[in-house]
Amino acid sequence: LGSTRLAQLLIEISEGNAPAKRRLRLELAGADSPTAVANQVRKRIATITRSRSFIDWHNRKSLIDDLEAQRRAIVDQLASRLPTEALELMWRFLELAESVFARCDDSSGTVINIFHSAVADLGAIAQSARPSAERLADQAFNALVRNGYGQFDDLIQALVPALGPMGLEHLKQRMIELSAQPVRKPAAKERQVIGWSSGGAIFADEIAERSRVSTVRLALQEIADAQGDVDAFIAQYEEPVRKAPKIAAEIARRLLAAHRLDEALQTLEETEHRRGGWPDFEWEDARIDVLEARDCSDEAQASRWSCFERALSARHLREYLKRLPEFDDFEAEERALSHAERYGSLLQAISFLVSWPSLDRAARTVTARAKELDGDHYELLTPAAEALAPKYPLAATLSLRAMIDFSLMKSRVGRYGHAARHLRECQGLASAITDYASFESHDIYVGRLRKDHGRKTAFWSMVS
């Protein structure tokens, strides 16, 4: 037939299938010349930009495929052959985000991931196209101040190699200029109310000002990281904010990387922790790393043990044990597992012991504290019962009964199917249990269920 006739036939066959037809046109254009591809992509981007109809779930996949096809065409067919044009088109592609998100639900995150991929592509293309550092910085600035949907969240990091020192400094100065330009507050009668909170009206100018402040702070922090300027990073946080555990950890890690160990430890020690005793893991991990860097291994070990003791953190326990001398680790592990059995949250204790794994202790904990079992937490009790069933059928049965009892006592009709399955599993385990100790046998338990919940026919119909 020849390639020309074959192409014509394929286009005729694809009539009525718009995505396939667009894909064919792109491929045919690529066989012709990169300029033809660029023209096709430019036209398609313009069409998507002009579209105003809401994209429902029926059309969502088509949109995703369309966006991905345009992005891939820029990357695969243009980036290496026409890098300057590819760079311009990728900027245009990223500008689609606002119009797309304004008419599309992206609760799954699939669409935003396409734009995040495009940002990464932009960085690579910019290195090949080699635009002027100042122009690229200006484009980055204009994008960051219009980052309403988070499409440009990773832009600075992606562009660092192409921006170079001059571009980063230019972008920094533009952000500093923006920091001195607060959003104008209109007269009271001109202010636009866009929502309500417990504190009263939410005004458009307030949101715009918060966005400006956040944009400047995040951009200057990323630039500071790229320039290796720890003090500039720290300067973006006011003194009280630096005392928050998460922020203190971020600052301390940068001071640690700069070998400013005393300042790193001081930053962490000045933190104001929340009440309750639960570890702030980011803060704890940063402190452990700083202590290790200062050769304070005993203090670091004490922190690891404390994290385990307070939260049954398996990660911290493993890190603790592997640093102990031979034979000491066995004794410490036994002490840790005994602590887990006595831990305040029974479900957390069971989850830890099952995953460690220490199934004998998990079974012992279940049987000793069976009255505390909360059957609402099926996400923990179901895998625990599955793990315990082969060797510890009584503990598995008690875990299953807890979920059955909760479903029936609370009349959770939606869970009746699972509860019925759990009851059948209990019946299967019954033959392996030689001693129920102080607990009801399977037959007595089923009899009690029929007495207390006999009228719940929806459940019993599923059992049989």
Protein language model regions, located:
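Eukaryote-biased, non-catalytic alpha-solenoid scaffold regions
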Residues: 1-464
